[in-house]
UniProtKB/Swiss-Prot annotation:
Belongs to the RecX family. It comes from Bacillus pumilus (strain SAFR-032). NCBIfam families: PRK14135.1. Its main location: cytoplasm. It is found in: Cytoplasm. The gene is recX. Keywords: Cytoplasm. Pfam families: RecX_HTH1, RecX_HTH2, RecX_HTH3. Modulates RecA activity. This is Regulatory protein RecX. GO terms for biological process: regulation of DNA repair. The lineage of its organism: Bacteria, Bacillati, Bacillota, Bacilli, Bacillales.
Length: 263
């Protein structure tokens, strides 16, 4: 049975020591593991002892890495597991580390999911379907996801969607209502809002001001079109202006009405 012939401190890490068995380097361990297993010169170690020591060392090392990783922000169990796997911590040790992290309340997937929904709802204006997809990618169980999303009911979704609609309307104010609505619907769908919430948000954001906003946008685009075609009042140039505005999504009746007013 091999025995410890030498224990030496590592040059670059004073918290770890090298263990030599029968005059040959065998492995390194944390000082806490050294004390825990009462490792000293002359002690005999069989294969089971070595496996147990190395397992304890992997848990010690991985636990500290996990705590450091968690110090920046909350993480899901899957995120911590993936991180430790990349750090080459053995799977059995990772299981023990996760158990310890849960015991000390360093990780909790339900709390993580609730915080994630709250944060990304407010800061990134995301809808429930996108949040659900992102949480699933982070390894959160379905029941935890549903519980977390319960704090994001329809009224809050509508409130957030209306803010997004108003912001986009201001940004795209010189486009036709049709074109603006198309852009809004696409963007809010990508953000994870349902068709029902999007339609309600559009109704609430416009609140009966569609015609006024449409005419303002049409006047702006008409001046742009006239400059582009070199408008001189002729029938040919008038048709070119109408075609330009129609392609931009404006209604033909509205175009004729505004053109006639401007003559």
């Amino acid at each position: 049975m091999p025995y410890i012939t030498k224990i030496s401190a590592q040059k670059n890490n004073t918290e770890r020591v090298n263990i030599f068995l029968d005059e040959k380097y065998a492995f390194s361990v944390d000082l806490d593991v050294l004390v825990q297993h009462d490792l000293k010169k002359g002690k005999e170690l069989d294969e089971a002892d070595i496996i147990d020591i190395q397992f304890g060392d992997a848990v010690k090392k991985g636990f500290q890495q996990a705590v450091d990783y968690l110090s920046y922000r909350m993480r899901s169990v899957k995120e911590v597991t993936d991180y430790l796997t990349k750090k080459e911590i053995p799977a059995p040790a990772i299981s023990e580390i996760i158990h310890k992290l849960k015991h000390y309340k360093y990780v909790n997937d339900l709390e993580f999911a609730e915080a994630y929904v709250s944060t990304h709802r407010k800061t990134n204006s995301k809808g429930p379907s996108v949040l659900k997809k992102e949480l699933k990618l982070k390894g959160i169980e379905d029941d935890h996801i549903e519980q977390a999303l319960s704090q994001y009911p329809d009224d809050l979704q509508l409130e957030e969607a209306v803010k997004q609609v108003q912001k986009l309307v201001r940004k795209e104010k010189n486009r036709s209502t049709k074109e603006i609505e198309q852009r809004i619907k696409l963007q809010l769908q990508r953000k994870g809002f349902s068709f029902e919430i999007i339609d309600k948000a559009l109704q609430e954001a416009y609140d009966g001001q569609e015609e006024e906003k449409e005419e303002e946008a049409l006047l702006y685009m008409m001046e742009k079109a006239k400059r582009k075609v070199g408008y001189d009042g002729s029938f040919e140039k008038k048709m070119k202006v109408k075609q330009f505005l129609f392609r931009k999504g404006f209604d033909l009746d509205t175009i004729d009405h505004v053109l006639d007013k401007g003559e």
